[in-house]
């Protein structure tokens, strides 16, 4: 996610995939291309790109925490939670995902339109 616009930077807790499914605090950077997760050891981070995401759902509010799930294209679900007060991470991620998908749809539509125009010669008449 180089040269991307950073929309939010802060902390979320991610549920681990292990047997105990412990919650681990991650520093998260939300950009216009996706979400990058960093562990406490300052590693290079794990990238969750919007092009690999299907949706954000299962938003639940319990005891001052917001729980939500990001569903990936392969069906994998990644669970997160954060404090209810402060930044609404779930809403920011969902809006950024919608913006990304809209941008891709507009670009796809433009490409189809330009491709269609290129296939019709200037003298051609469409019926």
Swiss-Prot record:
Signal sequence, start to end: none
Ranges for domain PH: 5-108
Record-linked InterPro entries: PH-like_dom_sf, PH_domain, PHLA1/2/3
Superkingdom field: Eukaryota
Keyword Cytoplasm: yes
GO biological process: intrinsic apoptotic signaling pathway in response to DNA damage by p53 class mediator; negative regulation of phosphatidylinositol 3-kinase/protein kinase B signal transduction; positive regulation of apoptotic process
Gene3D superfamilies: Pleckstrin-homology domain (PH domain)/Phosphotyrosine-binding domain (PTB)
Family (UniProt): Belongs to the PHLDA3 family.
Protein name: Pleckstrin homology-like domain family A member 3
């Amino acid at each position: 996610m180089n040269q991307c616009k950073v929309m939010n930077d802060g902390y979320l807790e991610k549920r681990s995939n292990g047997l105990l499914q412990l919650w681990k605090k991650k520093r998260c950077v939300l950009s216009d291309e996706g979400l990058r997760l960093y562990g406490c050891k300052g590693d290079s981070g794990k990238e969750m790109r919007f092009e690999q995401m299907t949706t954000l759902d299962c938003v639940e509010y319990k005891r001052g925490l917001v729980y939500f799930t990001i569903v990936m294209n392969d069906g994998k679900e990644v669970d997160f939670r954060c404090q209810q007060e402060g930044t609404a991470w779930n809403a920011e991620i969902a809006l950024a995902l919608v913006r990304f998908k809209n941008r891709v749809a507009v670009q796809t539509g433009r490409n189809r339109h330009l491709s269609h125009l290129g296939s019709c010669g200037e003298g051609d008449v469409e019926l």
